[in-house]
Design a protein with these regions (language model features):
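N-terminal Rossmann-fold NAD(P) dinucleotide-binding loop
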Residues: 171-172
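NAD(P)H dinucleotide-binding glycine-rich loop of Rossmann-like/cofactor-binding domains
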Residues: 88-165, 200
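Glycine-rich beta-strand-centered segment in the early N-terminal region that forms part
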Residues: 21-37, 47-92, 106-110, 128-131
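Glycine-rich phosphate-binding loop and adjacent beta-alpha segment
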Residues: 100-102, 181, 192, 199, ...
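Adenosine-nucleotide cofactor-binding segment
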Residues: 161-167, 179-239
Length: 334
């Protein structure tokens, strides 16, 4: 069968199609015929830099498909079921602990860029028929990270205001979930065209951070000086000081990305002054995933898929993400 892997070296140009034997499920295992995958910033880092992973590696964390074979003792799913892979293959429920985070797909475990993928049966969840395979493939990392951020760790509801940075996958999911939960949303971007698309999705206010670099102060103005209840922080060092300006006293900054780089500049006085909570978020449990999918089905909420590439154009898809030219999610089809 076909697999897309970094065999001897990392780098987009070194992610190539190879052949591997057909997988055979053992006890408690299943094989999934992969139908779609989606890109995350983590995948770009893994392919280009390795991100601490060893070669050879099949990258990409998020995919969806149909169960094509089951091993002995499997009862959670059956052949033909539509399923999503789960990023953490060992976090099923309960609070996050080190062991729960020890087996992520797409590094160090082989990821979803394979025609047929063997996994533990506990490492997938069923997906509703109302979602296409491409839509479902966006959920395991980006969707679940946004859900855990504003529905679990820093829950929002009617009367609350959140600020989402940019228009990538997690931020757009956070916008959609926040509106469904009844909250107000301020969205930022450097692109007026993307901000108009964010408004079409329900954003109450938008700020172009390129033309208005003091967007933290602007968020204060938009909330009559109070500040926002939650900031969905994706930029890291480049944006954290502005997030601390924007957040209200006693509010929360949920840190889910490091697009601005990996430095240690944390603005301690501002954090103290705001009595703000800073929460690191990386994906979630299977139980949280299932809760998210149930709410999405009830709300008839569909993920925003911006571009779809055939899997043999995966290098082009990664280059699009690298250029920041997307709104929402980029997907691959098998």
């Amino acid at each position: 069968m076909k697999v897309w892997a970094n065999q001897d070296a990392f780098g987009i140009e070194n992610l190539k199609e190879i052949e591997r034997p057909e997988p055979i499920p053992g006890a408690g295992e299943i094989v999934v015929e992969m139908k779609a995958a989606s890109l995350n910033y983590r995948d770009l880092l893994t392919v280009t830099m390795g991100a601490g992973n060893k070669l050879p590696l099949v990258p990409f964390s998020d995919g969806a498909g149909a169960v094509s074979a089951v091993g002995p003792g499997v009862s959670r799913v059956k052949v033909g079921d539509r399923v999503c892979s789960l990023f953490f293959q060992s976090w099923f429920d309960g609070p996050v602990i080190a062991e729960a985070r020890s087996k992520p797909l797409g590094g160090p475990l082989d990821g979803v860029l394979q025609q047929r993928m063997k996994m533990i049966a506990d490492g997938v969840s069923k997906i509703p028929d109302v979602l296409s395979f491409e839509e479902a493939a966006t959920l395991p990392c980006a969707g679940l990270t946004a859900w855990r951020a504003i529905a679990v760790e820093a829950p929002v509801g009617p009367g609350d205001t959140i600020l989402v940075q940019g228009t990538g996958g997690v931020s757009i999911f956070a916008l959609q979930f926040a509106k469904a939960l009844g909250a107000n949303v301020i969205a930022t971007s450097s692109s007026d065209e993307k901000l108009q698309r964010a408004k079409a999705l329900g954003a109450d206010h938008v700020i172009n951070y390129k033309t208005n670099p003091e967007w933290g102060k602007e968020a204060l103005k938009l909330t009559a000086g109070r500040g926002v209840d939650v900031v969905v922080e994706v930029g890291g060092d480049n944006t954290l000081s502005k997030s601390l300006e924007a957040v209200r006293v006693g509010g929360s900054i949920v840190v889910i990305g490091v697009l601005g780089g990996f430095t240690n500049n944390i603005f301690i006085p501002a954090l103290f002054g705001k009595n703000a909570k800073m929460i690191g978020i990386s994906v979630g449990s299977r139980e949280q995933f299932d809760d998210m999918v149930k709410h999405m089905a009830d709300w008839k909420l569909h993920p925003v898929v911006d571009r779809v590439f055939p899997v043999d154009q995966v290098q082009d898809a990664l280059k699009l993400m690298q250029a920041g030219g997307h709104f929402g999610k980029i997907c691959l089809t098998f």
